[in-house]
Design a protein with these regions (language model features):
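A short, well-ordered alpha-helix in the C-terminal region of glycosyltransferases
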Residues: 364, 371-387
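Membrane-proximal helix-turn-helix segments that form the acceptor-binding/catalytic region
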Residues: 22, 94, 98, 115-118, ...
Length: 415
């Protein structure tokens, strides 16, 4: 089977689960794989050294052919620039993709931006190629809830566009049962939708000796509550700082460790510095291997999201990473993520955006014995290996691709 991976990000850009490792695994399983994407610019919005914007270029990464097309690089708060980035990649991929890449049996659309279905629609129209829509963000909510695009009428236009992409897709992959229910409520036939949970970057998992040896960030000897990921509006990390402030005098040995970066980073640091908080540590974004060493010294891994309908439907990727790490997990989130973690047996939940509830939960976890927390972590790791691991997820993805590619071509969509 010849698979085209249509994606807004790809290596060397970080944190893309269905990137190069995914492509290599598909090749290992006997499939021909090609990638159609833009030029690497995430997360800073600047094109990486060694690349320059041009109409198109080809390269081979670990044996996988990658075709990159011209786009406007942006990943900041500007709605105009972000929109230009989304539309430019979709437009040039729609124009240049068909003549540049080998004709696929199926197109996998990593959505991301809903606009990226545009080139897949072109392949469908020109060659009858079916596409599988992998819904990672629910549009239009993902851009309207955050305030990225809040102009009158934008939500209606994006909603209509999204419905068209769902109708024309041969199959739709979603990351949670919450997303599945949402699409069904919007008229997508249940038989078209498959739930495939995301896996995590397993290179970032702590090794057996990662908690030993050098400790460059001074984590030893403290009870570390570690948050790793994006510092954005949806993560609502200001509330985590408030929780840390509430317990600093009660338990000065407890420290909140933030690993990563994002648009809220400066504001968070300013808030912590303004209150003189000593129980907060910010660590820059780390390579997967380095992150594993930090995770090994964590006592609790934190998942925190703003409390809104979009957050309740989805499952942030750090949920899987936290479970796989074999540590107790604290989720300040409701909905699909909390339901998934509850099945693992080693996670606590509390109300999101409630610093007092978060502080109480952290104090409760800190009061448990080491053996109790170790048991929680072991249950989480076992659940990840059996239900969420990379090999399991790729197998489920491949089955969806094969079903999409062999189904008789007929009018798609509708009931």
């Amino acid at each position: 089977m010849r698979v085209l991976l249509l994606t807004p990000l790809f290596q060397p850009e970080p944190n893309h689960l269905k990137g190069l490792a995914f492509a290599r695994e598909l090749v290992r399983r006997g499939h021909d794989v090609e990638v159609l994407t833009g030029f690497p610019h995430y997360p800073a919005g600047k094109v990486y050294p060694g690349y320059r914007i041009r109409p198109w270029m080809r390269e081979i990464l670990d044996g996988v052919p990658v075709t990159r097309v011209m786009m406007y690089p942006s990943h900041d708060r500007s709605a105009v620039r972000r929109t230009a980035g989304y539309l430019s990649l979709a437009g040039t991929a729609a124009l240049l993709g068909p003549p540049l890449v080998a004709r696929p049996d199926v197109v996998h659309v990593y959505q991301g931006p809903a606009t990226l279905a545009w080139p897949a629609m072109v392949f469908r129209m020109m060659f009858g190629t079916p596409y599988v829509l992998d819904v990672q963000d629910m549009w239009p909510e993902s851009v309207t809830v955050t305030g990225m695009l809040s102009l009158p009428g934008v939500s209606a236009v994006l909603g209509a566009w999204s419905k068209a992409t769902y109708r024309l897709a041969r199959k739709i992959i979603v990351l949670s049962n919450g997303y599945k229910k949402c699409l069904e409520a919007r008229g997508v036939p249940e038989k078209k939708i498959e739930v495939v949970y995301n896996w995590c970057d397993e290179r970032s998992l702590p090794g057996e000796t990662d908690g030993e040896g050098s400790d460059p960030f001074g984590l030893a000897g403290r009870f570390n509550v570690v948050y790793s990921g994006n510092f954005g509006a949806l993560q609502a990390l200001g509330g985590v700082l408030d929780a840390a402030f509430l317990i600093e005098e009660k338990r000065p040995d407890i420290r909140f460790v933030f690993v990563g970066d994002g648009v809220e980073e400066s504001a968070l640091k300013k808030k912590a510095d303004g209150r003189g908080q000593k129980n907060v540590l910010f660590i820059p974004r780390q390579a997967p291997e380095s992150l594993g060493r930090i995770t090994a010294r964590a006592d609790v891994l934190l998942v925190h999201l703003k409390d809104d309908p979009l957050a309740r439907m989805g499952i942030p990727q750090k949920t899987q990473a936290s479970l796989a790490a074999g540590k107790p997990v604290l989720l300040a989130i409701r909905g699909s993520a909390a339901e998934l973690a509850a099945r693992a047996g080693g996670a606590w939940t509390c109300r999101p955006e409630d610093p007092a509830a978060l502080a109480e939960a952290v104090l409760g976890l800190a009061s448990l014995s080491w053996n109790e927390r170790e048991t929680m972590g072991r249950r989480n790791a076992e659940f990840y290996r059996k239900e969420l691991a990379f090999s399991i997820g790729v197998g489920r993805m491949t089955a969806v691709f094969e079903e999409a590619a062999v189904r008789p071509r007929r009018k798609e969509g509708g009931r």
